[in-house]
Amino acid sequence: MKIIATIGPNSSNKKVLFEFINNSVDILRLNFSHFYEEEFRKILSYARSIKKDISIMADLCGKKIRVYENFDKVFKVNYDEVVYFCSSDVYSIINNNDENVKIIPLSIMSDIIQKNNIEKISMKDGSMNFDVIDKDKIFLKAISKNSGVIRKGKGCNIPGIDLGESVLSEKDKISLKWAINNNINIISQSYVETSKDILNIREYIKTINGNLKDIKIFSKIETQLALRNYKEIISCSDGIIIARGDLVPECGLITSVEEEFDLLRNLKSSNYNKDIIIATHILDSMKNGFSSTISELESIYTFINSGVTGFLLAGETSVGKKPVETVKLLKQLIRAYEK
């Protein structure tokens, strides 16, 4: 049973990395959505000085939609407030000097917005939600269902959106090249929806060093389309990660639980023998400095007995208040529940 720990501000120092590795963390995850080369080099150096052959996972951005990186404003959106979403190409040419009109540019092109029937948009793993109430050739007019702060890079979910042909982004190419050149041996791709998303990575790695033997590629299952296409996805992947942080806003809270266990049952019945990793919302209580809850422990127990082969800790270890304690508890639970 694997433990994957995401490295972030609260776990990037040598002391915490030593505790992680000493307490059975199998894989250290670097989130390339927030790529800081100097920091990543330091983490690799620290980790490999503790354990030379520690496995490192490079988690790529994939087709994740975000607030456009050239958005230079930060503002709060209140409950029941009207906002306007637009594409990155439109935002680059419009001139909005009206502070009373809140425009949120997304990292997609205008043709994607126009060809899709977008009804809902959510952000930050579903903690901010918007209902689309009107659409023209430039904007999606939406109303906020809760409050929160908007800034560049914030992750967005648009359930059922068709992003068109699968293409490896320039950002992912840069991340992949850096990962391979720094001897990272596990790649996980976000927002995989078809086998083409993984085959694109395999082809690109060949152009870097021509050798795929020592590199494992994991697919993150986190959209409705990925769930429908899981058979073709697992056929070309070395393992899958059921990424619940995005699966919940993509599928809905109630449906996402059904989808998780339907997928696990299908994999078990087909004698799937590769890694199945459960990610995010594992021990969220500890992320916020509290003790774990009985429901979290029951969930871990259920997953272990449903055939998963590991857990991926995200915010719990990257920004959580108890990163080492979280790893120690998960290790203890795995030992107890695997019997």
Residue ranges and their predicted role:
Residues 1-339:
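Non-catalytic helical/linker scaffolds that mediate oligomerization, partner binding
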